[in-house]
């Protein structure tokens, strides 16, 4: 496709109609914090958010990101969500990349940290920034259409569990997602943790999500793409065991990434 081109129809309206014909729900998938590399941004020209909302955008490692620490970022994201929820009969809003870049000590938010942190550590302030975005959008969606589900796909391991360590890569510390805090506050309807692992890197963490769900739906994302010989050459029974585990322990279902 070409950026800005008119396909001659409304793709989202088409997808919703076709899903509903088949008794399926349609959730609008929205990438949140990353904006793309310089080439992607340049292709959008004056339509890029980096031009329209320069104050909330920051460059980092040859890419552009929304700055979660800027108060106007949640307003901008809510404006996008509002357009979708008001105009379309979607069943849900699903957020991807609602996180900081991985291990980003030099992410350029020092000015906002000094201005807004109020004595919190940098890590806690960043976690609070993401939580405030989640809270603000969740409440906004429910005020418009209470039946629309709000969900996120976070990093698959929340943090170390009593059963098994996360080995230094987790939602809480690596990308500042306090997802179990969101569940505890009730500001997510569903969580799709990206559990693209197997063995001890899958089962203890899937169980941890379910135990901390606060009655919300936990739907693990399974790494179906690892069945491809060029990706991981997993055997089919690996995925089958994960599916049986999910059903046996009462999780709400599974998502398949990527088919």
Where are these regions (language model features)?
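Active-site-proximal loop/short-helix segments
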Residues: 34-50, 70, 83, 87-125
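Substrate-binding cleft/loops of secretory-pathway carbohydrate-active enzymes
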Residues: 144, 149-192, 197-208, 231
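Substrate-binding cleft of secreted/luminal carbohydrate-active enzymes
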Residues: 179-202, 216-259
């Amino acid at each position: 496709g070409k950026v800005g081109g008119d396909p001659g129809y409304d793709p989202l309206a088409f997808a919703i109609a076709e899903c509903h014909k088949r008794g399926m729900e349609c959730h609008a998938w929205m990438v949140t914090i990353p904006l793309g590399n310089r080439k992607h941004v340049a292709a959008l020209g004056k339509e890029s958010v980096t031009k329209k909302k320069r104050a909330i955008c920051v460059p980092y490692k040859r890419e552009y990101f929304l700055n979660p620490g800027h108060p106007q970022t949640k307003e901008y994201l809510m404006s996008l969500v509002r357009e979708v929820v008001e105009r379309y009969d979607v069943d849900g809003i699903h957020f991807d990349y609602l996180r900081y870049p991985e291990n980003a000590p030099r992410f350029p938010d020092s000015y906002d940290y000094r201005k807004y942190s109020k004595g919190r550590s940098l890590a806690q302030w960043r976690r609070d920034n993401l939580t405030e975005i989640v809270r603000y959008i969740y409440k906004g969606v429910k005020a418009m259409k209470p039946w629309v589900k709000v969900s996120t796909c976070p990093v698959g391991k929340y943090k170390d569990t009593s059963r098994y360590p996360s080995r230094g890569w987790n939602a809480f510390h690596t990308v500042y997602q306090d997802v179990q805090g969101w569940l505890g506050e009730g500001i997510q309807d569903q969580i799709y943790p990206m559990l693209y692992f197997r063995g001890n890197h899958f089962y203890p963490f899937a169980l941890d999500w379910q135990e901390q769900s606060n009655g919300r739906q936990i739907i693990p994302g399974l790494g179906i793409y690892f069945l491809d010989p060029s990706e991981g050459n997993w055997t089919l029974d690996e995925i089958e065991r994960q599916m049986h585990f999910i059903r046996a322990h009462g999780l709400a279902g599974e998502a398949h990434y990527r088919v």
